[in-house]
C-alpha cells in the first residue's frame, strides 16, 4: 500500500478525498512494473499563484499549469521510498473540467494518474511516447469507471 501525503495550499474546497486518491494511485500501480521499494507520494493542491511560480521556475513557462511532477531524486547511497511529488492547481483543474464538460472528480482522477505516470518515467514529448502514455491513462481510468479523457 502506498502512503500518500496530501497538502492543501489552496482555498479551493472541492478536492478529491484521500481514499479516492489512494484508489486512483493504487489502480495505476496495478498496470505498471515499478520499484517495489517505493511506497510514498506527496500531492500538494495549490492555487494559480503558486502554480505560476513553480511552472515559471522549473519549466520556464508563463502562467499556471494543471499538474507538475517532481520525481524523487535520492541521495546516492541512500535509498528513497518516495515516488516524488505532484503539485496540482485545483482551481485550474476545476475550470478545465467545466470547459471540457467533465466532472471535477474525473478530471482530478485523470491528472493525478497523468502526473503519477510522469513520476514513473512516462512522458509525452515524442508522439509514440504520448500514445503509450495516453493509452495507459485510458486503461487505468476505465478500470476506475471513468470515460476516456481524450474523447470529445
UniProtKB/Swiss-Prot annotation:
Its main location: cytoplasm. Binds 1 zinc ion. One of its GO terms (cellular component) is cytoplasm. Gene3D superfamilies: Metalloproteases ('zincins'), catalytic domain. Zn(2+) binds at residues 114, 118, 124. It is found in: Cytoplasm. It is an enzyme of class 3 (hydrolase). Its EC number is 3.1.-.-. HAMAP family: Endoribonucl_YbeY. Single strand-specific metallo-endoribonuclease involved in late-stage 70S ribosome quality control and in maturation of the 3' terminus of the 16S rRNA. This is Endoribonuclease YbeY. It comes from Coxiella burnetii (strain RSA 493 / Nine Mile phase I).
